[in-house]
């Protein structure tokens, strides 16, 4: 990592090298340590970025597969739990955090962006929650963040099912934005996120954004979600079953998408407001 002491900024970049900057426990510990240092040593904030071609291609699935092959389920649970704790720490940090994205920002990489206060995105940022494409679901807060963004950004009509159906479609089909501009229209980036056309200026622009953000910063308030519950879950599962009858999805696809439907609708409950921690 590097620091700019004159302006009291911290820039996290390339301390631990993984293939395509995949997220693993060492990277997560680095992020947690950075937030702790920034909060306790009065830094203005943190920029997360790198000089590589890709920001982050997702979680280190090789590590997860290795644990699964050994039936090391506790280690796998710990990996998932560490990710959830890390991303929530980014979201509610006492200092502002800016992500400087470029190239592939997939799965866990997209989740990093959605848990930062502002994204300074290179125009050639490819952003998406692609986990369903490899037979799993987003585990580090991507579902709740994307669901909340769709409604907050006014991308769907009001009502409990509009945002749920949109999130189910985008996440369930592993859609990827082909540019930062498209990512904004899809809800992966918001109206406060910024776009840099020149890759060479990305980190510089991110630092300037951080300085602006630090002047009057307060952490975001936790969201609550009004979800359709059992009836919404049944509707989504029915749609998936129709696809299964026509031979368009595999049996495992049904397992994965039903689990996704359970998360996005709040599970077997009536229409109710639930907290982000519940999701």
Segment roles from a protein language model:
Residues 2-8, 12, 278:
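Single conserved hydrophobic/aromatic residue that forms the stacking wall/gate
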């Amino acid at each position: 990592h590097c620091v700019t002491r004159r302006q009291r900024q911290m820039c996290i970049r390339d301390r631990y090298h993984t293939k395509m900057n995949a997220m693993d426990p060492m990277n997560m510990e680095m992020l947690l340590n950075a937030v702790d240092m920034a909060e306790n040593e009065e830094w203005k904030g943190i920029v997360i970025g790198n000089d590589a071609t890709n920001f982050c291609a997702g979680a280190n699935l090789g590590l997860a597969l290795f644990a699964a092959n050994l039936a090391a389920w506790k280690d796998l649970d710990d990996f998932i739990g560490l990710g959830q704790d890390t991303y929530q720490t980014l979201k509610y940090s006492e200092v502002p955090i800016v992500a400087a994205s470029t190239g592939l920002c997939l799965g866990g990489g997209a989740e990093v962006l959605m848990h930062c206060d502002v994204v300074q995105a290179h125009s050639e940022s490819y952003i998406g929650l692609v986990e369903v494409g490899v037979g799993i679901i987003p585990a580090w807060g991507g579902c709740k963040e994307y669901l909340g963004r769709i409604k907050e950004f006014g991308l769907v009509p009001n009502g409990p099912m509009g945002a749920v159906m949109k999130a189910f479609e985008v996440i369930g089909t592993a859609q990827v934005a082909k540019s930062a501009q498209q990512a904004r229209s899809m809800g992966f980036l918001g109206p406060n996120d910024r776009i840099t056309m020149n890759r060479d200026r990305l980190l510089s622009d991110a630092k300037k954004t951080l300085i602006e953000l630090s002047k009057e910063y307060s952490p975001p308030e936790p969201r609550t979600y009004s979800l359709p519950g059992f009836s919404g879950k049944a509707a989504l599962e029915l749609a998936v079953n129709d696809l299964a009858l026509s031979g368009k999805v595999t049996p495992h696809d049904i397992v994965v998408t039903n689990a996704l439907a359970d998360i996005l609708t709040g599970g077997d409950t009536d229409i109710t407001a639930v907290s982000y921690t519940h999701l």
